[in-house]
Amino acid sequence: MTGPRVRTVTAAALRAQPLPAPGGDKEQRGRVLIVGGSARVPGAVMLAGEAALRAGAGKLQLATAASVAPGMALAMPEALVLGLGENGQGEIVRGHRALDAAMSACDAAVIGPGMASTNTTAALVKRAIDQAVCTLVLDAGALSPRLRAPLGRPFVLTPHAGEMAALAGDDKAAVEAAPADYALAFAKKMRSVVIVKGADSFVAGPDGALWVHRGGVPGLGTSGSGDTLAGLIAGFAARGCDALTAALWGVFVHATAGKQLAKRIGTVGFLAREIPPEVPGILDRLPRG
């Protein structure tokens, strides 16, 4: 019995799944909402937000801990920033009507960067998911084995091997030995697009489609790198890509940015904040449909 066909994510393959035309209006390129962060880790939301804008999204909203929201608004003038209730540890624990309205009005959202995975944050994640009518990218603190996307509206889940192991209740070594199998199984179980990130990143769709991007550079294994990937995917989704296409473009562009930085700065040591500025030039050089 043969396994599923594995397709390779390349620039040529993406030609068959082109991005929507850039257009001249920010409304046409969509609105992205990033929900996450904490008083101790506010930067994750900013990394994802900048990546979404660099991918071409037209508008950006950030929802994070109220104590850091004013500073974030000053640091990122391109974004509308919402402050959320937090507990004594600075973790966001409560949504509100403004977040509900933002979630129901966005074209793509990222939930989870910089968030801890706790019972209290789980309630916030559930509330946000329940309000959403857009493509959702779930990362870090939003990942849960209980997730299951609505029929016809797959989530995009972006676990690394350790997070995938936690979702599966297995050890990390098992995931690293068979990442494609885990991606396929959980894509079907969660009715979602699942990216198991690594040097070779596997992307599986709920219909059994399986893709691999090979040759990621070691320097991408750095703090905040996954936040930029999640933001890129949301940016492409906001522009009009379906969940799988947005994931494939995100993985390829993220890896290409890493290769450029490795060549210019060094194999390791470049920073996650340096990834988003690479993106517009990469998009201009990639083949168009």
UniProtKB/Swiss-Prot annotation:
GO biological process: metabolite repair; nicotinamide nucleotide metabolic process
Binding site for AMP: 197-201, 226
InterPro entries cross-referenced by the UniProt entry: CARKD, Ribokinase-like
Keyword Nucleotide-binding: yes
Disulfide bonds: none
Pfam families, per database record: Carb_kinase
Location of the YjeF C-terminal domain: 9-286
Enzyme Commission number: 4.2.1.136
Cofactors that this protein relies on: Mg(2+)
Residue positions binding (6S)-NADPHX: 44, 160, 227
Coiled coil (residue ranges): none
Keywords from the named record: ATP-binding, Lyase, NAD, NADP, Nucleotide-binding
Domain of life: Bacteria
Record field: catalytic activity: (6S)-NADHX + ADP = AMP + phosphate + NADH + H(+); (6S)-NADPHX + ADP = AMP + phosphate + NADPH + H(+)
GO MF term set: ADP-dependent NAD(P)H-hydrate dehydratase activity; ATP binding; NAD(P)HX epimerase activity
Subunit comment: Homotetramer.
Protein task: Catalyzes the dehydration of the S-form of NAD(P)HX at the expense of ADP, which is converted to AMP. Together with NAD(P)HX epimerase, which catalyzes the epimerization of the S- and R-forms, the enzyme allows the repair of both epimers of NAD(P)HX, a damaged form of NAD(P)H that is a result of enzymatic or heat-dependent hydration.
Record's protein name: ADP-dependent (S)-NAD(P)H-hydrate dehydratase
Native source species: Xanthomonas campestris pv. campestris (strain ATCC 33913 / DSM 3586 / NCPPB 528 / LMG 568 / P 25)
